[in-house]
């Protein structure tokens, strides 16, 4: 997919969703061929080659079993890979995804004309210092995002690839249908889709959920293809995805507390039970003190306590805090 990992882990991150979802997990991201730090001169952009990109990254990272999280244009490659490698993909999350591109949905003449107009505007205006043409894409995909968020996304995309390659990515996904592959996906799958999605119709999300056996479907309020932080659906999809990915994680269900804690929350509570304060916990885990506080709030909620002392009592009653950091 079109991405720029180097930029996305800086202070001006345009798409913070994945980092939020992957907290306390290993997150592997990559720049697809034709974008980011990968070969920008690569011309043969297709869903098949996007699948090959994904396979190469998986092998290079030494991943034996893992979860795939994808959105929008990356969903087709994720579906294809998961169907072909059921022994490696444990879970899959698709946000604003689809199996069939526009040209496989019996588009009207108006829809085709609108697509061609937008693609022409993107290619011609991609390098303009004024982002008007690039904003056409963001306005259709993220109509609820703030102007600041939209501008940040256009800046990230412009720094990532060329207008020509962007158009190639759009054409590749709009002319591809992976519905048959979706039927062969075997892993548990969560599909989240905005009810009023301006880019990918809600019906396409529902259809995809019907194709993948036993998929879970999460309808989201709003119009953004993928919710941005200013959208209330952002927190909904982050929390739902975390819960979906953590189901069955060792140390969560069997912690003796009778509640489901994330791995990071479990670490924080263990250190609290050992008597460490927030500053000491932050140093031990390599986090900021603010991040530690942000973990403690949901711990209190899950334990149904209103202060640190009561949380520590519950933790020690469950056998936590016996080790020393």
Residue ranges: model-predicted function:
Residues 79, 83-84, 89-124:
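Flexible "cap/lid" loop of the alpha/beta hydrolase fold
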Residues 48-66:
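Conserved acidic catalytic loop of the alpha/beta-hydrolase fold
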Residues 126-172, 181:
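Conserved alpha/beta-hydrolase catalytic His-Asp/Glu region
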Residues 1-39:
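Conserved HGGG/HGGXW glycine-rich cap/lid loop of the alpha/beta-hydrolase fold
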Residues 198-204:
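Conserved alpha/beta-hydrolase "acid-adjacent" motif
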Residues 185, 191-193:
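Short beta-strand/loop motif that positions the catalytic acidic residue
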Residues 215-260:
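Catalytic active-site module of serine/aspartate enzymes centered on a nucleophile-bearing elbow/loop
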């Amino acid at each position: 997919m079109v991405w720029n990992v180097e930029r996305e882990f800086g202070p001006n991150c345009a798409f913070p969703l994945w980092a939020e979802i992957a907290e306390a997990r290993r997150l592997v991201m990559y720049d697809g061929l034709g974008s980011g730090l990968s070969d920008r001169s690569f011309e043969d952009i297709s869903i098949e080659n996007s699948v090959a990109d994904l396979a190469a990254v998986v092998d290079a990272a030494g991943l034996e079993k893992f979860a795939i999280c994808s959105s929008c244009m990356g969903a087709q490659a994720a579906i294809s890979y998961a169907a072909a490698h059921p022994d490696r993909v444990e879970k899959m999350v698709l946000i604003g995804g689809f199996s069939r591109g526009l040209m496989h949905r019996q588009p009207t003449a108006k829809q085709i004309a609108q697509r061609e107009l937008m693609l022409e505007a993107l290619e011609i205006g991609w390098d303009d210092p004024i982002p008007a043409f690039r904003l056409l894409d963001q306005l259709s995909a993220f109509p609820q995002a703030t102007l600041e968020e939209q501008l940040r996304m256009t800046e990230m995309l412009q720094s990532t690839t060329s207008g020509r390659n962007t158009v190639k990515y759009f054409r590749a996904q709009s002319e591809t249908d992976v519905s048959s592959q979706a039927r062969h996906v075997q892993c548990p799958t969560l599909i989240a889709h905005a009810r009023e999605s301006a880019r990918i119709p809600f019906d396409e999300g529902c259809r995809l959920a019907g194709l993948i056996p036993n998929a879970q479907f999460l309808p989201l309020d709003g119009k953004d293809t993928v919710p941005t932080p200013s959208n209330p659906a952002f927190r909904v999809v982050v929390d739902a995805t975390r819960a979906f990915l953590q189901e069955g994680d060792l140390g969560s269900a069997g912690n003796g507390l009778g509640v489901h804690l994330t791995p990071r929350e479990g670490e924080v509570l263990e250190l609290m039970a050992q008597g460490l304060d927030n500053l000491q916990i932050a140093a031990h885990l390599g986090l900021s003190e603010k991040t530690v506080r942000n973990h403690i709030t949901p711990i209190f909620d899950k334990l149904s306590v209103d202060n640190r002392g009561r949380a520590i009592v519950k933790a020690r009653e469950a056998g936590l805090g016996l080790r020393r950091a």
